[in-house]
């Protein structure tokens, strides 16, 4: 027996189903994008993903070198195609406060191949340069 659509139980069930769906989407995006970066030997491969336990799509791609890329759905208030975008940012050591690569967006619904191509072309060149600077600065401080 299904709960009536307006009851607290029904709302909770819808919320949990939507949360499960977002988590599965994030896992699929992370898994396929990590595989794509590894297939393309980006930074020699070794990328893996983690899904953040939050109520929106949030994936962290991590590399053994310490590099990381976060893909986060930040625009749930947006309408139309703008609502179907993920913001991609490079990760840096927490104590680093220098220049950072400019974030970019990719379509949630685009293929992993398309996402990887866009990230490699638009974000990675500046991220690699600024990440090396951050690591150099971090090593000097230690």
Where are these regions (language model features)?
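Negatively charged, low-complexity tracts enriched in Asp/Glu with abundant Ser/Thr
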Residues: 2-63, 130-142
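Intrinsically disordered, low-complexity regulatory segments enriched in Ser/Thr/Pro
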Residues: 1-11, 44-118
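Glycine-rich and polybasic anion-binding loops at the starts of cofactor/ligand-binding domains
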Residues: 127
């Amino acid at each position: 027996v299904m709960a009536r659509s307006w009851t607290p139980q029904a709302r909770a069930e819808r919320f949990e189903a939507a949360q499960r769906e977002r988590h599965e989407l994030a896992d699929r995006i992370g898994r396929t994008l990590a595989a794509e970066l590894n297939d393309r030997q980006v930074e020699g491969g070794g990328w893996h993903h983690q899904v953040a336990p939050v109520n929106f799509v949030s994936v962290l791609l991590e590399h053994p070198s310490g590099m990381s890329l976060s893909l986060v759905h930040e625009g749930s208030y947006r309408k139309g195609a703008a609502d179907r975008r993920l913001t991609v940012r490079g990760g840096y050591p927490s104590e680093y406060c220098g220049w950072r690569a400019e974030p970019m967006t990719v379509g949630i619904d685009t293929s992993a191949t398309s996402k990887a191509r866009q990230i490699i072309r638009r974000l990675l060149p500046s991220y690699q340069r600024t990440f090396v600077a951050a690591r150099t600065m971090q090593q000097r401080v230690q």
